[in-house]
């Protein structure tokens, strides 16, 4: 025990000069390092200073952390009598420190805290959040994973009625909320195409209005009269409804074949799909009493959608699609599944229901004439209609080809 006391007594004079020199250097400099005045050593530091040097010499390969562990364990087992001289030395160093630095105040060193990473929301969530501010979220069809071009076709709104532009798109929400969960990666690719696509379609649907699309309807109007008027003369011609029904069949085509190639069908010229809607609404009003309920439902849907803007009609018409689509799948002797780009076939699919009720022979003749006209017109269809038609073959087989 005396040997340890002698060692500490020998080392204790050496403890003071480093602390004094460091303190005087810090006090005389009056520089930035004056803020870093070291704290006075406590009893353990006074004792462990000499012991650390001795243990490092005995075990040169031992790490400093291991030395600290052993010194701490050894200090704990020491008695009060053994610690007394080191405690006294620490008191003397503290008094000296207070004398040299009367205004010293311990300021703990600020530890650089690692910044917590912000939660990265997915792009879909970001798009849905943006939809709350009046922007549009993007929902992709099952075939939309191949690229961004296919995803833009079935754009939808997640939060209807929010923001300035959300009022026009509010009714599109009923089309693909739970049916088509889009992948986030493809949604990111589709977000770039979204703005230009939306601007073009909105401009085509709002600015031309009812007057802009009807000039495209009339060139097809004479073609329907030879096929329909001989069989459906008792039903009068009501005025064509507002331009909302023109999107009935492009949305139904998307519903049955949501493929990337259908984007060109969605964004085709107004003469392409404008005539489809007019012919479909016209044939419904010209139909026999069996299709009168369908026409009434379509008219009610169009009237309900008229108050929500030009684009608001898309969702409401899609919601009424189940009442229109059953004749498509109904297999009769004269029924043929429609090609989305063929005007004649969409007309002829309503002919058998009206013709068989009145004159079956006349209905068969009209269906044959419509089939001949359809096959002759298939070769002159635009490329995007053919692409959409080939996509439909997976669900509705084309028997006339």
UniProtKB/Swiss-Prot annotation:
Motif (9aaTAD): 345-353
Record bears the keyword Nucleus: yes
Function per UniProt: Transcriptional activator. Participates in neural induction.
Main location: nucleus
Location of region: Disordered: 1-38, 197-249, 320-343
InterPro entries (UniProt xref): HMG_box_dom, HMG_box_dom_sf, SOX_fam, SRY-related_HMG-box_TF-like
Keyword terms, alphabetized: Activator, Developmental protein, DNA-binding, Nucleus, Transcription, Transcription regulation
Residue ranges flagged as DNA-binding region: 37-105
Biased amino acid composition, Low complexity: 197-208
CDD domains, alphabetized: HMG-box_SoxB
One GO cellular component term noted in the UniProt record for this chain: nucleus
Gene Ontology MF terms in the entry: DNA binding
Localisation: Nucleus
One protein family per Pfam: SOXp
Domain notes: The 9aaTAD motif is a transactivation domain present in a large number of yeast and animal transcription factors.
Lineage: Eukaryota, Metazoa, Chordata, Craniata, Vertebrata
Name of this chain's protein: Transcription factor Sox-1
Biased segments, Basic residues type: 213-234
Biased composition (Pro residues): 235-245
Highest taxon above the source species: Eukaryota
Biological-process GO terms, alphabetical: nervous system development; regulation of DNA-templated transcription
Organism, as annotated: Xenopus tropicalis (Western clawed frog)
Keyword Methyltransferase: no
